[in-house]
Amino acid sequence: MPGFSSPAIILRRTAYAEYDTILDLLTLERGRITAMAKNARKSKKRFAGILEPFCCLDAVFTDPSARSGMTILKEAAMTAPFGAIRLNMEKVAYASYWSEMVNRWVKEDDTQSALFHLLHYVLFMLDSGKASHADLSILFQVRFMTLAGLFPGMAACRVCKTEIDRLSGSPTLYLDIARGGIVCHRCGGEGAGSQYRKPLSRGLVKQFLWVRETDLPQAERMRFTAAAREQGLAALEAFVTYHLAMEIKSLKVLQRIRHW
């Protein structure tokens, strides 16, 4: 039966029937796919210990058959277990949030090689413990929104069109979630308490733009103050869920257990 091979990251797994497992994966070659691992929960040799969430595999698949319409995971070898993530509840929550974002946004068989490399990179860094969980989430969300064509307009106020470098007075800006970009303190002050308008310092906006435009290893070195981190995550998470137009269940878990 025709098939294909590809590096793949496990986004989600679901038990199916008595012994099978359904996997949602982001693959380098085909984008997001759903595949069945037959007898995965019965065999102790074939897929032993490698079908865990966030694992990266070299995988071989059969193309969907006319009868079942299901892609089959034929064989797989672990390339990166990212096991340290699953030993820490907060790491699991962040990785689950990123994975759910990808799983909900990427269409099946829509190749997203840049997104694959982005997700692999942040999972690698999260597993290594070399970077702040929250800073990695800012990096991921900024780059994800850029790839998805959803990144908010941050060069100028969406209302008065004044460029941020030309604004005088208060350094506080607001991310107007419904307008899809920032508004200045003069145009955004009235709705400052709204769930659809989140405060952002001018310095944080510039950090977002730098993270968006530089290469990944350099962007990962960006460090945020505690206040900027909390402000940035509140704004980005609200923006992502609004513009993806869907509930991201893992985000609620993350927000309950997150340690600042």
Swiss-Prot record:
The keyword Lyase does not apply. Pfam families: RecO_C, RecO_N. It comes from the Bacteria. Coiled coil: none annotated. The keyword DNA repair applies. SUPFAM superfamilies: ArfGap/RecO-like zinc finger, Nucleic acid-binding proteins. Keywords: DNA damage, DNA recombination, DNA repair. One of its GO terms (biological process) is double-strand break repair. GO terms for cellular component: bacterial nucleoid. Involved in DNA repair and RecF pathway recombination. Belongs to the RecO family. NCBIfam families: reco. This is DNA repair protein RecO. It comes from Desulfosudis oleivorans (strain DSM 6200 / JCM 39069 / Hxd3) (Desulfococcus oleovorans). The lineage of its organism: Bacteria, Pseudomonadati, Thermodesulfobacteriota, Desulfobacteria, Desulfobacterales.
